[in-house]
């Protein structure tokens, strides 16, 4: 997909290549990433944050495309092919992954701050065990919320990842927080 940030336009393609172009469409840099880019990358504090279909999250230098860090985790044999974006707040990237995993990762270093499971995979077949987080996590005050396909919705504290509340509600579309004051 095409995405923009600052004065650059960038293109992610299915073959795992990411390119940066100037506003006058001159190539600035191109780089290989670990897999197919299925969502819009984000640019924060000079770092391009990109998710790939193989369950990895990469931080790239916005000026030259060089990889600064890589967060990776295993991917089950069967997943939902909807790859959620990430939410970024207070120098932390919040991302939902396959098998119901929600992770908080340092924007500057890629080091895991905390990880938790929103919904445990369960069932007797691979299809029944799909519990992927299929939408971007939602931030609200000091909590991050995520919902899993065939699973549950849950909210956690931003800082430590402590469970604040959860309900057995499944979704493949995501969640919205609405304050009814």
Set out the residue ranges of the language-model regions.
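Tandem repeat domain/solenoid detector
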Residues: 55-56, 66
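Structural signature of WD-repeat beta-propellers
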Residues: 6, 13-14, 52-53, 97-98, ...
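Extracytoplasmic beta-rich repeat domains
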Residues: 1-3, 28-44, 67-90, 115-140, ...
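Post-signal-peptide, soluble extracytosolic/periplasmic N-terminal scaffold domains
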Residues: 1, 7-14, 20-22
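Short loop/turn segments that connect beta-strands within beta-propeller blades
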Residues: 22-26, 61-65, 106-110, 157-160
